[in-house]
Amino acid sequence: MTERTVRTSPLTSTLGRMLVALAASLLLGAGCSGEEAGPGDGPGTTNQCLSERDYFAKNVWAPVLAKTCTKCHAPGGQADEEGAKFTLLPSAYPGFVDANLAAAKLFAKTEYDGKSVLLRKPLGELEHGGEKQLEADSAEYRALEAFIQKVKNNDFCQGGSSVKGFDDVVLHDTLTTYRMATLNLAARLPNAGEIQRILDDGEQALEPLLDELMKEDAFFTRLKEMYNDMLLGDRYLGYSSYALNLLNKSHFPQAGDAWFETLPDAEKPKVNTAIAREPLELIAYIVRNERPFTEVLTADYTLMNPMSARVYNASLQFSNPNDENEWKAGQIVAKGNPANNEPADMVLPHAGVLSSPIFLNRFPTTPTNLNRHRARMVLKFFLATDILRIAERPIDPTQATSYNNPTREDPSCNVCHRMLDPIAGAFMKFNDNDQEKFEPNKNWHAAMFPPGFGKEVMETSQYGQALSWLAERVVKDPRFSLSVVYTAFHALTGEEPLAYPDVDDEGFEQKLASWESQDALFRSIGDVFVASNYNLKAAFKGVILSPYFRAKNTLGTPTPARQIELGAVGTGKLSTPEVLARKIQAVTGLPWARTSGGYKVHLLTTDYRILYGGIDSDDVTMRLTVPNGVMANVGWRMANEVACQTTAWDLSLSKHSDRFLFPYVTVDDTPESNAASIRKNIQYLHAHILGEALPAGDPELERTYELFVATLAEGQAKLASQELGASLSTACRARRNPYTEQDLPTDQRLEQDPDYTVRAWTAVISYLLADFGFLYE
């Protein structure tokens, strides 16, 4: 949609006039409600000439194997424990369809007396431990027969798919999509040049513009927010020495009395921030320089500024030793203890964020946990695998006493520990109590599964580099690229990726279609990410260009079944406190802030951060995505206070081209004297604040105009009865320059409102700032 750019100084009114003039034509160009859905069996349908993968998922996995076989043949199941070669991954495993297809094909081709083993075993033949599971005349058995015949004859469609498309979904137009992206990722609106490129080149302009957008400093601020939601290291910004207090002072003496404790109190927060945000700066460095994002785990370095380099005993040269914003790649050096057979200087074996002292402390271990918590985070963050979902089964606690080593011997336990413990072993060289303390002579626990990854066991000669050994294997796993897409998707949409539905769920077919569509898109984006040499920006672009970010409506009214299929598609994410704070400033020109220590402090990122659904990375680690009563009240307060502080200030600017909100009106304009300009400014405000390019006469514009007229009439009546005075309330006056805090010249001040127009416009701004279209993305 058409928008006015917000920078440190606003656009010229020429562009503003162009945007309003284009509103009607762009609306017509973007609308598709009159288009036909096209041929086929209905919106979103596809022909049923299926690829091998889709045929298996639809006709074999869901109705047969998932229901009949996985209970025993899953990892840790009875068949698996008894050494069965046929293993099926439950749907909680990313990539389970491909893995299970490979297993099914292998056994489909394996025959005994001319008949596939995959057909004999379910009938209880060939000493099947599970005995008879299917009848030969059942629909499930016939499905297996059909699959095996197709495998033998390679009778699958090349490129065929059961995945339903989005042909019945109406997407936001190119300009609206880009506006959404700029506000989310770069804290600004599109500028005049970008708008013109989109008007000239249409959809072809979007991807290059996104590439340029993701080079801006504001994008990296947003990127670090996104990854802090995962890593939660900002917990250690809680007080000025929180992060430093984590570090072992014998390994890092500069973190204590040798240097840090001698600093003035005003300087300590800078050092603390450098240590606390080290993993986030590493991520930003990798993305800024378009290095392979695999380095988030494999980097043999981390990022340091002059302060953190001193703490970490790193020999780095900086242009300015006092510049907290100068970051360089370097390696952490710990001071060793020769009495423990440690070298005087130990260069820690780096493995991206995994070896970061902040990561190790934020996800700590204990002498009994033995790094399993860290292993769970590796699986969750970088392999898209929730280990807690994989073993969702009843556990009899009394059975554990039947085993000397339950985590290895009890099937109820080892289903997770077989996957978890080898990864935990990669952290073996770190102290069980002093989280980041590296102990090169420490070894693993013989009672646990040996260090490794998947079915590969780590050689003991690799124990000294165990984390980097693990990292190299994690990033080569197909789940790594999927995890990156999951992170980008959640950050941009606020939604979690869909889980594979239960076959007994009501509406299973529709939920399955929804999952298949999303899974196909995620795998496609993951492939592009890998092909781009693991450039993280490719994953972000893939999500932004998808219907999950861009969808706004459907062609006509979808059927109840189609509504289920499209349930995860579309916009409507509640803005985070951080994003909303920047959006307010981008749109109005001023922050919703208070002054503290001579600085403007955003209220949404301080006083109201938790109340508006944000996190503190400590006690509150999950953002609220559905507003409650308190959040609604914060939104109303924001709208009222921002409208109060911005309206008179904007109207006081003599050059209309300098205004953010009122380029078409003056304080003297009333419905009687200049209704056309008032209507035009309202049309502009809908485009500027809400991203709505509405044609003149649209009901939404009429409602806003009626609000202005009604507020004006009510106020003028109270002025006439002297119930109200002409003076604006102190907080709403334009008396001081909000940027410089200096008093305005007398002739520029706007403190009186004899016609009540300032207050009527304040009501309009408050109304729009409290709108769903502003508070949500």
Whereabouts are the PLM-identified features?
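Conserved S/T- and glycine-rich ATP-binding loop of Class I adenylate-forming
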Residues: 1, 187, 539
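N-terminal secretory signal peptides that target proteins for export/translocation
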Residues: 1-14
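The N-terminal extracellular segments of secreted preproproteins, especially immediately downstream
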Residues: 3-6, 31, 48, 68-71, ...
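Bacterial N-terminal signal peptides
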Residues: 17-29
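Aromatic- and Gly/Pro-enriched helix-to-coil junctions and flexible linker segments
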Residues: 32-233, 242, 310, 446-498, ...
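His/Asp/Glu-rich metal/cofactor-coordinating catalytic motifs and the adjacent surface-exposed loops
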Residues: 145, 155-160, 169-182, 210-465, ...
